[in-house]
Each structure stands twice: as C-alpha cells, then as structure tokens.
C-alpha cells in the first residue's frame, strides 16, 4: 500500500490511500541434498544423508512517506524486519540517568539504557534500528542423518537444526513485544525463578548492602510493580539467538525370522524397533525449547518420546 503516492503533505494526513500491489521485493535462496552409500564387506553398510534450505529476501521498493533517517525505511531490508533500540546495559546510578538522553517514563538506576542513534538528546521511535530479519523464521534449515546396518541390526540417527534465527524474549509472535516474563505478567511464566535469583538482576545497594549487586551488565533490570514503560521496549537487551541443533530421532531395529511363526501364522519376518524422539538439543536459549522461542516459553514443551514398535511381514 502507498500512503504517499501523488498526495501533498496536507492530504496525506486526511486521506486513506487504497491498497495496491505496487511494491517490489527480491527473494533468493538455495536448497540441496546429498546421500553417500558405502558397503562394508557383505554384512554391513553405511548411508549418510544431508539436506539444507537457505532463504533470504530484500525489499527493493516500498512506497511510503519520507522518513527522516534512512535506517527507518523499508527499502534495502528484509520483509518483516524486526526493529528496536540498541541497549547499552543498565543505568549505573542517578548521575548516569541525569547525564543521559531522556527515555520513557520515570527512569531510575537499574533500568535499561538505550543508545541515542540520531543524537537529538532523547530516545524516541526515531532511534529504532533494524535488529534482525525474518522475525522468528530461520533463514537456514538443515538435516543430517545416518543409517548403520550390520546383518539383522539397523541403527538410524537424525539431526535437524536451524541457523540465522533471532527473536525477542517476550514477543508472542517474534515481532510484537510486551515485555519479558515475568516483567509483563506477575502471575505466570516459567522463568520467574531465574529473575528471582539475585545474581541475575540489578539490585540497589540500599537494599542489598552490597555495591556489587548494582551490576550494569545484569541479565535482568531492576524489579518493579506493574508495567515499566521503559524496560518493555523491543531492544537488543531482550534479543536472543534461536539457532539450534536437535537430536530428533534415534532408533535401533532388529529384523527376526522365525520359521515356526511362518508355518503356523504365515509371518515371514518380524522387525522389533526401539524409537527415541527429541532426545537432546544444543542451543543458547536454555530456559525453554528454541522451537518455542516466539511463544516465550508459554507453550507446552516438546516432550521426549520413547516407543517400542513391532512390525509383522506376512
């Protein structure tokens, strides 16, 4: 939609332009798969498999009202790019607050300190910059699998993972942001115990009796009652890396032939298989499953599953 095409400044504020397919976006990427087979003697073989998908895009033309700074424009950035403030840690003391640009609401020591990108002496939406692209959707996805077979035994393993995938803690859809739990909701959130740990948050020395607790690099800002207008802004302070590598499947199977069963029941062979799913994940999120990053851990976690399966071949 173009809210500006062909309109003067006066009319832009009074007329709602209709939607139109007038933008241009470039999309590109790559995908591929590979399989390797190796026979080992007459009783064993190994199969290695891998695949990947890489997807990127860039807006070439987005008709919009003129922005005061180029980093506020959509042109040249990915579609649905996440914008936010650049955090500089936490305010150290009241002097630090007074010597810094004005921010949001009543700011105190222990609150998040933002960078004044345009240098106008105040923090506003004009200081929001592109933080990351794709808003919770990974640019890179891949899988790695292997099969090892020896006589009647078969071992299968499957890994899957993502790359180039960031998110905001507290963003319910990876884009909107209402604050990091438990700072936005006092009655729920599976990370409340993390914030409760004094080592993870800024605490005034007036209460702790220890100057070291006023840590400007703490994981959490100061605690407060209700909602803090300053600390619930989208920023690099709440940005996380959602890339991961997961051991998705691991199975061990044994193929068995019992002549007596073939004569009596017509069963030519049986395959007994132990299947394990979602066994382990390596990531930097830690406090909840990285595939649930956009839900901020409020969804039911992905369980590990174990099953014993029996297949009959008649």
Predicted regions and their residues:
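Repeated loop/turn-to-beta-strand initiation elements of outer-membrane beta-barrel proteins
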Residues: 41-42, 152-157, 259-260
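Conserved small-residue
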Residues: 23-26, 30, 37-136, 171-217
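Transmembrane beta-strands of outer-membrane beta-barrel pores
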Residues: 36-38, 52-58, 150-152, 161-165, ...
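Outer-membrane beta-barrel "beta-signal"
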Residues: 31-33, 302-314
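Extracytoplasmic gating/loop element in the C-terminal half of outer-membrane beta-barrel translocons
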Residues: 162-266, 270
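Membrane-embedded beta-strand positions of outer-membrane beta-barrel proteins
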Residues: 32, 48-50, 157, 272-274, ...
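Transmembrane beta-barrel architecture of outer-membrane proteins
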Residues: 15-16, 24-30, 52-58, 138-142, ...
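Single conserved hydrophobic/aromatic residue that forms the stacking wall/gate
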Residues: 1-11
